Amino acid sequence: MKVALGGTFEPLHEGHKKLIDVAIKLGGRDITIGVTSDRMARARIRSVLPFAIRAENVKRYVMRKYGFEPEIVKITNPYGKTLDVDFEYLVVSPETYEMALKINQKREELGKRKITIVKVDWMMAEDGKPISSTRIKRGEIDRYGGII
């Protein structure tokens, strides 16, 4: 089963790892992980590491935990490869769920079948709020959700 997920993945935290773990449970080695291009990542308010470093961090996580090198692609537009490739599943967070609905709407307009959306709940930090890259960058929590 072909599975996709995407994101900026910076810094790579427990919430990201949960998304990757769910994708691998669904698709095994047949996963495509989209990592946003530097241009797309720079559209965010906070600074992020270059694409090559972010992609390498994701690859390293999968290789260490699962023993294989995942397919990693650069996302240069909001849809990534989801309009071109017939994925079975699209793994998303609550933050990216609306975009997943737009992807399926666009796929329908193109005469393609919808992708099954798998929404993975937030990973909560010690304070009961979601772990997020923004909160980590602000120094509120660490990558594991611990209060700093």
UniProtKB/Swiss-Prot annotation:
Q: Which UniProt keywords apply?
A: ATP-binding, Coenzyme A biosynthesis, Cytoplasm, Nucleotide-binding, Nucleotidyltransferase, Transferase
What biological-process GO terms show up in the record?
A: coenzyme A biosynthetic process
Pull one GO CC term from this UniProt entry.
cytoplasm
Subcellular location, record wording: Cytoplasm
**Enzyme Commission numbers on file:** 2.7.7.3
Concerning CDD domains, the annotation shows: PPAT_CoAS
Functional description taken from the UniProt entry: Reversibly transfers an adenylyl group from ATP to 4'-phosphopantetheine, yielding dephospho-CoA (dPCoA) and pyrophosphate.
What name goes with this protein? Phosphopantetheine adenylyltransferase
- Gene name for this UniProt entry: coaD
